[in-house]
UniProtKB/Swiss-Prot annotation:
Limits of the PAS domain: 286-356
Domain Histidine kinase: 421-651
Transmembrane parts of this sequence: 39-59, 207-227
Record's subcellular location: Plastid, Chloroplast membrane
Species the sequence originates in: Pyropia yezoensis (Susabi-nori)
Reaction equation(s) it catalyzes: ATP + protein L-histidine = ADP + protein N-phospho-L-histidine
PANTHER family: DRUG SENSORY PROTEIN A, TWO-COMPONENT HISTIDINE KINASE
Name assigned to this protein: Uncharacterized sensor-like histidine kinase ycf26
Residue ranges annotated for the HAMP domain, each copy included: 225-277
GO molecular function: ATP binding; phosphorelay sensor kinase activity
EC number annotated for this UniProt entry: 2.7.13.3
InterPro entries the record matches: HAMP_dom, HATPase_C_sf, His_kinase_dom, HisK_dim/P_dom, HisK_dim/P_sf, PAS, PAS-like_dom_sf, PAS_fold
BP GO annotations: regulation of DNA-templated transcription
C-alpha cells in the first residue's frame, strides 16, 4: 500500500512536470520570431554585462588570496621559530602564555593548534580539545607526517570547509635538527575586504542584469504604446474595412505623421461608410421594386443561386408548396420541396448546372410538366431559366417560374367529359328520333295507327329529352353571365306544391314516398319564382334519380333566425326560411362532396348507371347565389343525402 502511494505521488509529480513543460513549449511557440531574437539578445547582453564585475571580482580575489597566503606563511614561520624552543623544553606554561599573547595581539588569527610528535593535541586556542577532535580530522596530520618530515619547515596551506567564513589553514612542522617535535596549525581569517567586495560585486552584477532587462521592458512598453498600438489599431481597422465593416474608427491622441495617418484613415472609413449606405439604399430600393413586381405575378417565382439555395420566393410559390411561416431564404431548395417534385425537378437543375460549369455551354430555358398524385392531385408547369453574368458567361443562378395548371387541367378533363356526355346525350335522342321517323317514313303503309302513335310518342319523348339537355346548357350559360334576375315577394309554398305535383307521378312509378313537411303560416320569401321552381325541380329530380325503390324523399321548410352584424357590432336577427330536401338514396362520398357542385361533373361518372349532363347542381348553386345564399350538403355514402339552403323573408310579410 505504501509503495502504491509512492508510485501515485511520483506519477502525479511526473504529470505535473509534463503539464508545465507542455505549457512552456506552447508559450514559447506562441512567441513570434522577432520577440524570441530580442529576448535572446537581451539575455546574452545582460549576462555579459553582469559577468564583467564577477570576472573583476575573481581576479581581485585571487590576488588577495595570494597576499593572505604569503602573510599566513610568514606569520606561521615567525610563530614556529618562537614556539620550537619552548616545545623542545617541554614548558607548557610558557607555551600557553606565549600563544595566548600572540593570539590576542593578532586579530587576523582565527585559531592556533599545537600537536605533539605523536599527533595528539598539545595546546589549542580558542577551541577546547574536544572541539578540536570534532571539528578537525586528525587523520590529515597522520597523513602529513611523512611529508612534513621530508619538507622540513615548509608550511602547507589548506582551505578548510568545516568552519564558517574564508579561512587560510596553515600547517607547519616544528623540527629541531631534523627531529619532529610537533605540528603547528594556524587558522588565519581571510581579508574582510574580500568578503565585502564579493557581496558588492554580486549586488552590482544583479543590478546590472535587472537594469538591462528593466530598460528593455520599458523600451518595449514605450514602443507598444507609441508605435505598436496605433499600428495594430490601423491593422485591425484595415481588416474590418476589407471585410465590409466601414464603421471602424481609430481614436488615439497622436500627432505628427502617425496622427495624420490616423486622421486620413478615419476620413477614408467615413467616405466608404457613406458610399456603402448609398449603395445599400439603392439596392434596397431596387430589391423592393423587384419583390413588389414578383409578388404581383400570378405564377409562382423562385430565384436560386448557383448552389441551388433560395434567394427569393414570391407569395404564390409559398402558397403552392405550403411554406407559410417558414424562413427558407438561404436554404437548399431540395430540403423544402415535396419528394415527388424533387424527383422530377432536381435532375433538370443538375443538368443546367453541369452544362454551364463542366461543358461551358449556355443552357436555354427548360420546361417541365410535374404531376403530383400522392397526397393531392396537382399539375405544375415549371420553367427553368438560367441567370448569367453575360460579361463572363458564368452561371449566377436559376429562375424558376411555377404555373399551377391544376384547375386548367381539371377543367379540360371535365370539359372533355362534358363534351363526351353531351355528345352522347345528344346523339342518343337524335338517333332515336331519326330511327323512328325513318321507320314511319319507310313502313307507314304496313304500320297500323297504334304503332304509328307509339313511334311518334317515343320520338316526342326523345325530343323533350333533347330539349331539356339544351335548356340546361343555356340555363347555366345565362346564370353565369351578368344578367340580373329581379327578386320579389313570392309564395314559397305554392312553388313547392307545384313542383311536388310534377314529380309525384314519377315517385309513384318508382315506389318512392315523396313527402312534404311545411311549417304553418310560412311567410313569403324574397326570390324569383321561376328560378326557385328550377331549384326545387333539380334537387327533387336528383333525389328521385339516386333513390332506389321503397325509398323516402322529404321536402321540409321552416323559419330560422340568422345572426348578422351591424356597423356598431350589435347582433341583428334576420328571419329566413330554410328549405331541406333529404332522401334515403345512394349518398355521396366526402371526396365527391367537395366537387359535386362543379360544372360538367356528374355523380354518375362514379356510378356509371344513371343518365344526366352533370349541370343540375351547378345550376342550383348559381341560382341560390343569385338569391344571396349558399347551398349546403350533408351526406353519408349508402345512407342518403340532405341538401338545404336559406331564403330571406320578404319585408312586406
Amino acid at each position: 500500500m505504501f509503495s502504491s502511494s509512492i508510485l501515485t505521488i511520483i506519477s502525479s509529480i511526473d504529470n505535473f512536470i509534463t503539464i508545465i513543460v507542455n505549457n512552456l513549449k506552447k508559450w514559447w511557440s506562441d512567441i513570434t520570431l522577432q520577440t524570441r531574437i530580442m529576448a535572446m539578445t537581451t539575455l546574452m547582453v545582460s549576462l555579459l554585462m553582469s559577468s564583467l564585475p564577477s570576472g573583476l571580482k575573481l581576479i581581485s580575489k585571487q590576488e588577495t588570496r595570494l597576499v593572505d597566503n604569503r602573510f599566513g606563511k610568514d606569520l606561521s614561520l615567525l610563530l614556529a621559530v618562537n614556539i620550537t624552543p619552548i616545545l623542545e623544553g617541554n614548558n607548557y606554561l610558557q607555551l600557553q602564555q606565549f600563544i595566548e599573547h600572540f593570539y590576542l595581539s593578532t586579530s587576523s588569527i582565527r585559531y592556533i593548534l599545537v600537536f605533539n610528535a605523536e599527533g595528539q593535541i598539545y595546546y589549542s586556542i580558542p577551541f577546547s580539545s574536544e572541539t578540536v577532535v570534532n571539528l578537525f580530522s586528525l587523520s590529515d596530520y597522520e597523513c602529513l607526517r611523512s611529508e612534513i618530515y621530508y619538507f622540513s619547515n615548509t608550511p602547507i596551506v589548506n582551505t578548510p570547509n568545516h568552519l564558517e567564513g574564508e579561512i587560510i589553514d596553515i600547517i607547519i612542522p616544528l623540527n629541531k635538527e631534523k627531529k619532529l617535535l610537533g605540528v603547528l596549525n594556524i587558522g588565519i581569517n581571510s581579508n574582510p575586504t574580500l568578503t565585502t567586495s564579493s557581496q558588492l560585486t554580486r549586488d552590482v552584477s544583479v543590478a546590472v542584469f535587472v537594469s538591462i532587462w528593466l530598460m528593455v521592458i520599458l523600451g518595449a512598453a514605450f514602443n507598444a504604446f507609441t508605435i505598436t498600438k496605433p499600428i495594430r489599431e490601423l491593422l485591425t481597422g484595415v481588416k474590418n474595412i476589407a471585410s465590409g465593416d466601414f464603421h471602424q474608427r481609430i481614436s488615439l491622441p497622436f500627432g505628427g505623421e502617425l496622427g495624420a495617418l490616423i486622421f486620413n484613415f478615419n476620413e477614408m472609413a467615413e467616405r466608404l461608410e457613406k458610399y456603402e449606405q448609398q449603395n445599400v439604399e439603392k439596392l434596397t430600393s431596387e430589391k423592393a421594386k423587384l419583390e413588389t413586381l414578383v409578388s404581383t405575378i400570378a405564377d409562382g417565382a423562385i430565384l436560386l443561386d448557383k448552389d441551388l439555395r433560395v434567394i427569393l420566393v414570391n407569395r404564390t410559390a409559398i402558397e403552392n408548396f405550403g411554406w407559410e411561416g417558414k424562413d427558407i431564404a438561404g436554404s437548399m431548395i431540395i430540403d423544402y420541396l415535396p419528394e415527388d417534385i424533387n424527383q422530377q425537378l432536381f435532375p433538370a437543375l443538375n443538368d443546367i448546372v453541369r452544362k454551364n460549369f463542366l461543358e461551358q455551354s449556355l443552357c436555354e430555358t427548360q420546361e417541365i410538366c410535374i404531376k403530383l398524385q400522392k397526397n393531392y392531385k396537382k399539375t405544375f408547369r415549371v420553367l427553368l431559366t438560367t441567370v448569367l453574368d453575360y460579361k463572363y458567361s458564368i452561371l449566377k443562378g436559376i429562375a424558376i417560374t411555377i404555373q399551377d395548371r391544376t384547375e386548367e387541367v381539371e377543367l379540360n378533363e371535365v370539359k372533355n367529359q362534358f363534351i363526351s356526355n353531351v355528345s352522347h346525350e345528344l346523339r342518343t335522342p337524335l338517333f332515336n328520333i331519326r330511327s323512328f321517323l325513318e321507320t314511319l317514313y319507310e313502313y307507314h303503309d304496313s304500320l297500323d295507327n297504334r304503332q304509328k302513335l307509339e313511334f311518334l310518342a317515343i320520338a316526342n319523348k326523345e325530343t323533350e329529352r333533347l330539349t331539356r339537355l339544351v335548356n340546361d346548357v343555356l340555363d347555366l350559360s345565362r346564370l353565369e353571365s351578368d344578367q340580373e334576375y329581379p327578386l320579389q315577394s313570392m309564395d314559397l309554398v305554392s312553388a313547392i306544391e307545384q313542383t311536388v305535383r310534377t314529380y309525384q307521378l314519377s315517385a309513384k312509378d318508382k315506389k318512392i314516398d315523396l313527402h312534404i313537411d311545411i311549417e304553418e303560416n310560412l311567410p313569403c320569401i324574397l326570390g324569383n319564382y321561376s328560378l326557385v321552381l328550377q331549384i326545387l325541380a333539380n334537387l327533387i329530380g336528383n333525389s328521385l334519380k339516386f333513390t332506389h325503390s321503397d325509398g323516402i324523399i322529404v321536402l321540409r321548410t321552416y323559419r330560422i333566425n340568422d345572426s348578422a352584424s351591424k356597423l356598431n357590432s350589435t347582433p341583428l336577427q334576420i328571419q329566413k326560411v330554410r328549405v331541406e330536401i333529404c332522401d334515403t338514396g345512394i349518398g355521396i362520398s366526402k371526396k365527391n362532396q367537395e366537387r359535386i357542385f362543379a360544372r360538367f361533373l356528374r355523380i354518375e361518372n362514379y356510378v356509371h348507371t344513371l343518365e344526366g349532363t352533370g349541370l343540375g347542381l351547378s345550376i342550383v348553386k348559381n341560382i341560390i347565389q343569385k338569391h344571396n345564399s349558399e347551398i349546403h350538403l350533408y351526406s353519408e355514402l349508402k345512407n342518403g343525402s340532405c341538401f338545404f339552403f336559406d331564403l330571406i323573408i320578404a319585408k312586406d310579410t
